[in-house]
């Protein structure tokens, strides 16, 4: 096993990773609420934890990776009613779109993708245990709430004391609650809501609260105590704090050993929001940029750092990824098995073992590319392809990538080939001024030509 230190939000420090069961890792990541297209913030969660999943496997661990799907909540109900469709029709469609976006970004499908609606019995069972222990109560409005002040460890993940917590922080104040900080476990049904949003329970018809869904699904699939729980930094409080209160309150055991949170995504140094008009879906971004460029851009930043999205940064990522593919285009690595005793691989593994430090790890890839360009080393090409593969990068044929870069206004491959043929004809007629004009025209359109021995001409997008 490669040594691994991971920043644990719960401990507020990097810690050596020691799995509960030697050689095996059980990991849960909070997934999407499926009522709309995934945005660039979702893309970061997908890619970051796919990177973690891939590296854990490369480091020799047997990984069970669970990422849930929230397919019932207020926003989903509201959107389905607005659209005049069933909840199932809405969520099935957006689950498909989510899978398409994830596949485009090179994300390996998790081992389990539990849907909240399939685990309502487990949620009711957990709520019953909490009520039996005096940690939950049914309020006068019919909701079942968690009594926050009765759980001694509340606030240990976020570092918030009960005195410091503001009533209503992402939790609406409700007169029926015994305490403003209490949160809902079971929402009583309203007459105006569609029948498919309601389940029977001993507390009356209703549906689960957001937080209980993840507690029940993670414990059902990974056990009451597992290794890693991840998600975006925005979920640290209250969602993950509430998960701890629910899961540990119900089981009496530690819930998760290590909590990971990826940083926020900003758009041109501003918070991403629909009101600011800087809200981008993955699909919108992929109209302008190759999906591997987007993945490269996300991994170029450390997962805990803020990620600033801008066209300039995406363009820079495209040029950088092009450099790596260009180094591989004339090589025949003959496989991509990594020699982990080789110095570049050791540096790469050290970086990844230091809290998944992808910026340092990726600098090793550029060192290898420089060596390939300098020496033509097949061994270096094999290392470059193999190490990049552990990040889900450089897995395509180099010529396919170099000729397929996204460009909204650029010429098509057919148009490029016609211009190359015209240039070749001009050279044959010794009309070098016309040949130079065509080369300049293509270069202005972002197409770089490279003349090869024997008269062939290769091209790539700049």
Curated annotation (Swiss-Prot):
Keywords, in A-Z order: Aminoacyl-tRNA synthetase, ATP-binding, Cytoplasm, Ligase, Metal-binding, Nucleotide-binding, Protein biosynthesis, Zinc
What does this protein need as cofactor?
Zn(2+)
Q: Which InterPro entries match?
A: Cys-tRNA-ligase (IPR015803), Cys-tRNA-synt_Ia_DALR (IPR015273), Cys-tRNA/MSH_ligase (IPR024909), CysS_C (IPR056411), Rossmann-like_a/b/a_fold (IPR014729), tRNA-synt_1_cat_dom (IPR032678), tRNAsynth_Ia_anticodon-bd (IPR009080)
Residue positions of motif 'KMSKS' region: 271-275
GO molecular function terms listed in the Swiss-Prot or TrEMBL record: ATP binding; cysteine-tRNA ligase activity; zinc ion binding
Q: Where is this motif: 'HIGH' region?
A: 32-42
User: What does this protein's record comment on cofactor binding?
Assistant: Binds 1 zinc ion per subunit.
**Which Enzyme Commission number(s) are on file for it?**
6.1.1.16
Q: Which reaction does it catalyse?
A: tRNA(Cys) + L-cysteine + ATP = L-cysteinyl-tRNA(Cys) + AMP + diphosphate
Binding residues for Zn(2+): 30, 214, 239, 243
An example GO CC term for this entry is: cytosol
Q: Where in the cell is it found?
A: Cytoplasm
Which Pfam family name is an example for this entry? Answer: DALR_2
Q: Tell me the protein family, please.
A: Belongs to the class-I aminoacyl-tRNA synthetase family.
Its name, as the record gives it, is Cysteine--tRNA ligase
């Amino acid at each position: 096993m490669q040594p691994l230190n991971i920043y644990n939000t719960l401990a507020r420090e990097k810690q050596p990773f020691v799995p509960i069961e030697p050689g095996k890792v059980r990991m849960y990541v909070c997934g999407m609420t499926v009522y709309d297209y995934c945005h660039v913030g979702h893309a970061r969660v997908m890619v970051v934890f796919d990177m973690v999943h891939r590296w854990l496997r490369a480091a020799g661990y047997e990984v069970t990776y669970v990422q849930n799907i929230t397919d019932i909540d207020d926003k989903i109900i509201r959107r389905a009613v607005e659209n005049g469709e069933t909840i199932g029709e809405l969520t099935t469609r957006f689950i498909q779109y989510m899978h398409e976006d994830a596949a485009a970004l090179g994300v390996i499908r998790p081992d389990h993708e539990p849907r909240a609606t399939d685990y309502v019995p487990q949620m009711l069972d957990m709520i019953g245990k909490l009520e039996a222990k005096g940690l939950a109560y049914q309020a006068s409005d019919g909701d079942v709430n968690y009594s926050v002040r009765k759980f001694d460890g509340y606030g240990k993940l976020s570092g918030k004391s009960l005195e410091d917590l503001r009533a209503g922080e992402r939790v609406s104040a409700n007169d029926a609650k015994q305490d403003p900080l209490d949160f809902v476990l079971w929402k009583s049904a309203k007459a105006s809501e569609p029948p498919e949003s309601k389940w029977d329970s001993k507390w009356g018809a209703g549906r689960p609260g957001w937080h209980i869904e993840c507690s029940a699904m993670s414990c059902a699939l990974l056990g009451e105590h597992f290794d890693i729980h991840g998600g975006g930094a925005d979920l640290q409080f209250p969602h993950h704090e509430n998960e701890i209160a629910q899961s540990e309150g119900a089981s009496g055991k530690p819930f998760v050993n290590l909590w990971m949170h990826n940083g926020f995504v900003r758009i041109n140094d501003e918070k991403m929001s629909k009101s600011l008009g800087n809200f981008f879906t993955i699909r919108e971004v992929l109209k302008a940029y190759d999906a591997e460029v987007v993945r490269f851009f996300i991994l170029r930043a450390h997962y805990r750092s803020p990620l600033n999205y801008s066209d300039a940064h995406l363009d820079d990522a495209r040029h950088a990824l092009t450099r790596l593919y260009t180094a591989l285009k004339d090589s025949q690595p003959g496989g991509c098995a990594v020699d982990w005793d080789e110095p570049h691989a050791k540096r790469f593994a050290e970086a990844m073992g230091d809290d998944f430090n992808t910026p340092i790890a990726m600098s090793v890839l550029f060192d290898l590319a420089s060596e390939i360009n300098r020496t033509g080393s097949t061994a270096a090409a094999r290392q470059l392809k193999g190490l990049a593969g552990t990040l889900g990068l450089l897995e395509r044929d180099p010529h396919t990538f170099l000729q397929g870069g996204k460009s909204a206004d650029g010429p098509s491959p057919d148009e490029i080939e016609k211009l190359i043929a015209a240039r070749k004809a001009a050279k044959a007629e010794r009309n070098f001024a016309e040949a130079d004009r065509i080369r300049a025209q293509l270069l202005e359109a972002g197409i770089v030509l490279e003349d090869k021995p024997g008269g062939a001409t290769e091209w790539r997008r700049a």
